[in-house]
A protein has these predicted regions:
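Accessory interaction regions appended to the cores of large information-processing enzymes
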Residues: 1-398
């Protein structure tokens, strides 16, 4: 145990509250955890990050001899930076870094190379989009059949109101399966935001900004497949039917089911794909939309080069919301799609002879313009090794 005094670390027997403490020997600790010797103590409230990673790059060491060190370094970075997501591409084995933007990932790569001494190869940045829907199924449920044809699930989907989606994003309702004994209380909290109380009291699970509810009546043996149904729901939340991108702001309703009486015929290999297909088919039956991440941006520059600033912003599908002037300096304030922000730092320096100062902040997601829907989804699907054409409902009927 040590106290931090400037950049110096002074070892002490104990540290009183209000000081900055340095601990060694707690390798498994990550940012935001509570360390205590009392097993019954209440942990500090978790640090909640409202911004989601919107840009991903694949990284790998240039020298395979650095691989063990590279893996350890990624674990360390993931613990120290809670806004950085570290994962592995199961098909290629590449390490994937997902962060708040291009600059965030550039800093992470810099730390890998300069602080850890590992030279890495980095892919082009990839934007993380979100799939959603803009309408319900008009009462037309979609039937999903199990591979053995003995089980059928009927699903309807509808978009969640924006205030409910935002509350889910902020973690108001928690995440994961909802225990039966907690469903009533969770449903009542949804009702406070205008949702149907009776329906939401039958909630099965929450996954990110999506919810699943059981809107069936008297289905025999349904409770035995509850966990498998939730697993199918979670699969679709990770990869939607349009472009295998995460789902956002959708309510999935199980409205009916026909189950084989013998449990051996409704196991995981039968139930999960049936539910997954039913949800994907229902989503396609609704009007599919893509959401893209955007950034708030502010650029300060001398008046004589502000024309170059506005030109750079507008050519990148940016929206200028305000242009205040203070003496010889003007500011451009607005929003810009993350997908259009790559290379912006170099271009804005060139447009202003290096005289601009700017900052960005994640601003959530907005609808991708309909004119770009086809080209963007085709590009995503091609990158992921999928057919460029989005499958129709019929793809999920068998």
């Amino acid at each position: 145990v040590s106290m931090m005094v400037g950049s110096d670390r002074i070892q002490v027997p104990e540290v009183s509250s209000g000081n900055i403490v340095a601990l060694t020997g707690v390798r498994s600790a990550a940012a935001g955890v509570t360390i205590t010797l009392d097993e019954d103590s209440t942990p500090f409230e978790a640090i909640r990050h409202y911004s989601e990673p919107v840009v991903t790059v694949a990284v790998e060491p240039k020298s395979m001899k650095d691989l063990p060190k590279f893996i350890d370094a990624l674990r360390t970075l993931g613990k120290a930076d809670a806004s950085l997501q570290v994962s592995t591409n199961q098909e290629t084995g590449e390490a994937l870094l997902a962060g708040m933007g291009e600059l965030h990932l550039e800093i992470t790569v810099y730390r890998l190379e300069e602080e850890q001494g590992i030279k890495v190869t980095v892919s082009e940045p990839i934007v993380v989009y979100r799939e959603s829907i803009s309408s319900d199924n008009n009462g037309r449920s979609f039937e999903g059949k199990s591979p053995n044809r003995h089980n059928r699930f009927y699903i309807e989907t509808e978009p969640l109101p924006d205030d409910v989606t935002n509350a889910l994003r902020e973690g108001v309702f928690g995440d994961g399966p909802v225990r039966l004994k907690d469903a009533k209380g969770v449903g009542d909290r949804f009702a406070e935001l205008g949702m149907d109380k009776d329906l939401m009291r039958k909630i099965y699970a929450i996954n990110g900004t999506n919810v699943m509810v059981n809107d069936t009546k008297g289905i025999q043996n349904l409770h035995e497949t509850r966990e498998l149904i939730i697993e199918g729901f979670n699969d679709v939340c990770k990869k939607g039917p349009v472009a295998d991108e995460p789902l956002m702001g959708v309510m999935v309703r199980l409205v009916d089911a026909k189950l084989h009486e013998d449990a051996i015929h409704r196991g995981p290999a039968q139930t999960i794909p049936a539910v997954r297909n039913a949800i994907k088919g229902a989503l396609l039956r609704s009007k599919s939309v893509i959401f893209e991440p955007i950034q708030k941006i502010r650029i300060d520059a001398p008046n004589d080069v502000i024309g170059g600033v506005t030109r750079e912003v507008t050519t990148r599908r940016g929206v200028i919301e305000d242009m205040p002037v203070d003496g010889n300096t003007a500011s451009v304030i607005g929003t810009m799609p993350v997908a259009e922000s790559f290379g912006f730092s170099n271009d804005i320096r060139a447009a202003t002879q290096g005289r601009a100062v700017w900052n960005t902040e994640n601003a959530g997601y907005v609808h991708l313009p309909p004119s770009l829907f086809g080209s963007v989804t085709a590009e995503i699907r091609e990158r992921k090794g999928l057919k460029q054409e989005i499958p129709g409902e019929a793809h999920y009927t068998d």
